[in-house]
Curated annotation (Swiss-Prot):
Pfam families: Anticodon_1, tRNA-synt_1, Val_tRNA-synt_C. Residues 856-917 form a coiled coil. Monomer. This is Valine--tRNA ligase. It catalyses: tRNA(Val) + L-valine + ATP = L-valyl-tRNA(Val) + AMP + diphosphate. Transmembrane segments: none annotated. It is found in: Cytoplasm. It comes from Mesorhizobium japonicum (strain LMG 29417 / CECT 9101 / MAFF 303099) (Mesorhizobium loti (strain MAFF 303099)). Keywords: Aminoacyl-tRNA synthetase, ATP-binding, Coiled coil, Cytoplasm, Ligase, Nucleotide-binding, Protein biosynthesis.
């Protein structure tokens, strides 16, 4: 006998242990002979990470697909693994070392990396245990890590191959530079922070004019939020159609403080409507300016150190062509070495003293910050390794255009194309110690040798230098003669961008570059489930690498899920204090309740607004199923292997089997089309509404009656439907359903398999007549209950029922279902009439009008007054909200989640208004 209540805290670890001991999720477990493969690779969470709501949604949806296809008999692999998370992991270990007063630079690179591996062994990967608590059914025996031996081998193979194909190269370009972490970072690691700053308007004197701050003809005004970068200005840009400046194009201005003569160039980047219409161009310190600089062949002058301090001394690019007068030199010396923000204040002072500061305006604007270092990043000109993304992107664009890979929802394809068709070279190097060290070695003259191993690089270098004539040949020969070959090459210290190894994930985890059986079986993978924020950083790059090295797309479908927000629609963040920890929710409500809630709310293209109250509600759904199973047990329901669907004779049983067939199709269609919310909704409606509320209720007289054949049939039918329910719900609610499956095997019996390996339901039973008959009864009783509720009829009151205009079918149903109608709708005599009695509330069902004479049961006038008062109150609220939402200022300035919440309130009030109006009309008509 089942326990009285379901205890998730007891059942979930028990079931997890059962799965683990049975090795239930290994690749191919439960598959039919020669089954088609189904593969998903997990988006590898950071080794430093812990489970957040985004992970919970992402992995719940993956697990639904995986469990569903496993039950459909496919050869399933859900490949788990973790990302080495270069910057994040290095920071964690550095912080730990600093607690012991040890700086990273106090250690050798090898010693530090050893510390990182020690940390991973002790603390890394806690997220996998958390995912297991969620119920994730990955093949945990195949766990991979982007720095493990096999994946490192794949990374070397890819880098060396792309380099030798000319698709990886070194270049000097602008990067996002984190001056705290001292490394280039990706766009994904940059956060935009709104800050209250200033817009400084500077006067740049025209060459050949005597500068007069009172005479606009002697200068051109530019505005900037970053005065410190003016030291690296190499042009002023104006729009080619701007009549105010057309006569100045081609002329020079003299850069204050510096004395550099820089040209006025015509470029569409300048906006005539913004500020003065003229903008300073600093190619070495602004991404847009860098592009302007390329178009006009302007020099790029870097005036910052890697720590973002001013660097003027010995800066050849800065000093080139300048007249270093004693006055200027003194100013430069004063600025040299200053922190960028200290220098900003000093430069503004100097500009003001020289009459070059026209005005200062308060200006709120976005400043990019490193998400790990937490300081403003610098667009920084530095030599880095790059991949030719434009070339690699071409096949990846074609794959989506030609439908070999599809995005769901389809609108994300536009985002993909926008990114891919405007792609820039991919900066793949990082100035870190933790990561895949770039397999490049430099000879004594700076020549690069790229090979998989140092031995191969040294061999290539020796061959190259010994074929030369001159000093380098002699130098190398000397090292070889003195047994010092190790001095010939110096390895590049940089590591690869974490996304580089992640881009190989779908095939490297299967053993590539070796042609393993797993690679042949499970590549290409079927679907990638991911958030929209990494479509470019990860999805696009997997497409590039998969097509280049496997000559096949890594997946045929990319399902892009939405964000999980708080109940008000606000993005979760620690600063707002609205972060919800999924483990807390699992502790309180159970994993199944959390999973089902996320599934119900996972509508395509709509963010999930997570309210813990909803999770409590869906926990009640699990309780409902548990109690339904207990009810079945108490009524001696047991599995009967001899039960055949077509043998069912009772209309109520034939009805539930028909509805089961329909629900199974809806759930299957929902999952296969990635409409998870529709699948969950269909399951909820069938289990709660049809099975529990109606079917079991309609069976009570059967179980209490004396017809043994009807009892036996109904018991077998209930057992069959419950088994199908467990299967249909299993992908969404795996723990409870697996427990119920085991507990209902029958006395002294065991199931043939775990539920996770049971065959997916495909019932094929349709009895339209029985379905129409019972659904008519459900609609009739529901309509009567609705009227009673709307009109405040006391629950115990028995009302007569009068039916007007009934045809032969309805009359026959009224007779056949007489006892059920009276019991479920709480009505007395049922009669037919030609007209509705006075004082009756009416509903229309098919051709008939159903009348409830209520005049003797309620005070119709008082009820009308109550409804009128409620309707007036709701109408007043609608007017207030409509006025608020018609205020353009409110809509534009209020946080988006507040506006959305008000819109939802308005929709709720309008719905209430409609219902109250219907109820009021009914009362008045009855009176």
């Amino acid at each position: 006998m089942l326990e009285k209540t379901y205890d998730a805290k007891t059942v979930e670890p028990k079931i997890a242990k059962v799965w683990e001991e049975a090795d239930a999720f290994r690749a191919g477990a439960g598959a039919e002979e020669g089954a088609e493969a189904f593969t998903i690779v997990i988006p590898p969470p950071n080794v430093t990470g812990s489970l957040h709501m985004g992970h919970a949604l992402n992995n719940t949806l993956q697990d639904i697909l995986v469990r569903f296809e496993r039950m459909r008999g496919k050869n399933v692999l859900w490949q788990p693994g973790m990302d080495h998370a270069g910057i994040a992991t290095q920071m964690v270990v550095e912080r730990q070392l600093m607690e012991k007063q040890i700086h990273r630079r106090d250690l050798t690179r090898e010693q530090f990396i050893e510390k990182v591996w020690e940390w991973k062994a002790e603390s890394g990967g806690t997220i996998f245990n958390q995912l297991k608590r969620l119920g994730a059914s990955a093949d945990w025996s195949r766990e991979r890590f982007t720095m493990d031996e096999g994946l490192s081998k794949a990374v070397l193979e890819v880098f060396v191959t792309l380099y030798k194909e000319g698709l990886i190269y070194k270049d000097k370009r602008l990067v996002n530079w984190d001056p705290r972490l001292l490394t280039a970072i990706s766009d994904l690691e940059v956060e935009q922070h709104e800050v209250n700053g200033n817009l400084w308007h500077f006067r740049y004197p025209l060459e050949g004019e005597t500068f007069d701050p009172e005479n606009p003809k002697t200068f051109i005004t530019v505005a900037t939020t970053r005065p410190e970068t003016m030291l690296g200005d190499t042009a002023v840009a104006v729009h080619p159609d701007d009549e105010r400046y057309r006569h100045l194009v081609g002329k020079n201005v003299v850069l204050p403080i510096v004395g550099r003569k820089i040209p006025v160039v015509a470029d569409e980047y300048s906006d005539p409507e913004k500020g003065s219409g003229a903008v300073k161009i600093t190619p070495a310190h602004d991404f847009n300016d860098f592009e302007v600089g390329k178009r006009h062949k302007l020099p790029a002058i870097n005036i910052l150190t890697v720590e973002a301090a001013i660097k003027l001394k010995d800066n050849e690019d800065f000093l080139a062509g300048l007249d270093a007068t004693p006055e200027r030199q003194a100013v430069w010396d004063e600025l040299d070495g200053l922190d960028r923000f200290v220098a900003r204040k000093k430069i503004v002072e100097l500009m003001e003293e020289g009459g070059f500061l026209e005005k200062v305006e308060p200006h709120r604007h976005a400043v990019p910050h490193g998400d790990r270092g937490g300081v403003p990043i610098e667009p920084f000109l530095t030599e880095q390794w790059y991949a030719n993304a434009a070339e690699l992107a071409k096949p990846a664009i074609a794959s989506v255009r030609e439908g070999r890979t599809n995005f769901v929802p389809k609108n994300w394809e536009k985002t993909y194309f926008d990114w891919m068709e405007n792609i820039q070279p991919w900066c793949i190097s990082r100035q870190l110690w933790w990561g895949h060290q770039i397999p490049a070695w430099y000879g004594p003259d700076g020549r690069v040798f790229v090979e998989k191993t140092e031995e191969e690089a040294l061999s290539a270098a020796i061959e190259y230098y010994l074929a030369l004539e001159g000093p380098w040949k002699a130098w190398v020969e000397d090292r070889l003669e003195n047994f010092q070959p190790g001095e010939i090459l110096t390895r590049d210290e940089d590591v690869l961008d974490t996304w580089f190894s992640s881009a190989l994930w779908p095939f490297s985890t299967l053993g590539w570059p070796d042609q393993t059986p797993e690679l042949k079986t499970y590549y290409q993978t079927d679907v990638l489930v991911t958030g929209f924020d990494i479509i470019f950083f990860w999805v696009a790059r997997m497409m590039m690498m998969g097509l280049h090295f496997m000559d096949e797309e890594p997946f045929h479908t990319v399902y892009v899920h939405a964000l999980v927000r708080d109940k008000n629609g606000a993005k979760m963040s620690k600063s707002k204090g609205n972060v919800i920890d999924p483990l807390d929710l699992i502790d309180e409500y159970g994993a199944d309740a959390l999973r089902f809630t996320l599934t119900v709310m996972a509508a395509q293209g709509r963010d999930v607004k997570l309210d813990p109250a909803r999770i409590a509600g869906y926990r009640n759904f699990g309780t409902k199923l548990w109690n339904a199973t207990r009810f079945a047990e108490m009524n001696e329901v047991a599995r009967n292997d001899d039960f055949w669907l077509n043998d069912a004779k009772l209309a109520v049983n034939r009805w539930i089997l028909t509805e089961l067939t329909r629900a199974a199709r809806q759930i299957t269609d929902g999952i296969t089309s990635y409409r998870f919310n529709e699948a969950a909704g269909a399951a909820y409606r069938f289990v709660w509404n049809l099975f529990c509320d109606w079917y079991l209720e309609l069976l009570k007289p059967v179980f209490m009656g004396t017809d043994e054949a009807a009892k036996a049939e109904s018991r077998a039918c209930v057992a069959f439907v419950l088994d199908e329910i467990y299967k249909l719900l299993h992908p969404m609610m795996p723990f409870m359903t697996e427990e119920l499956w085991a507990q209902t095997a029958g006395e002294g019996k065991e199931r043939e398999s775990l539920l996770c390996h049971a065959a997916w339901p495909s019932p094929d039973f349709e009895d339209d007549e029985a379905a129409a008959d019972i659904n008519w009864l459900v609609d009739l009783v529901s309509g009567i209950r609705s009227v009673r509720s709307e009109m405040n009829v006391p629950p115990a009151a028995i009302a007569p029922l009068v039916v007007v205009g009934a045809n032969g079918v309805t009359r026959e149903r009224l007779v056949r279902q007489d006892s059920a109608i009276k019991r479920l709708a709480r009505v007395g005599d049922i009669s037919l009439a030609d007209a509705a009695p006075k004082g009756s509330a009416q509903i229309v069902l098919n051709e008939a009008t159903i009348c409830l004479p209520l005049g003797s049961l309620i005070d119709l006038a008082a009820e009308a007054a109550r409804l009128q008062k409620e309707l007036a109150k709701v109408t007043e609220e609608i007017a207030r909200l409509h006025k608020k939402l018609s205020n353009e200022r409110f809509v534009a300035s209020a946080p988006a989640e507040i506006v959305e919440a008000e819109r939802e309130k308005l929709a709720e009030y309008r719905d209430a208004q409609d219902k109250l109006a219907v109820a009021l009309t009914r009362v008045r008509d009855a009176g």
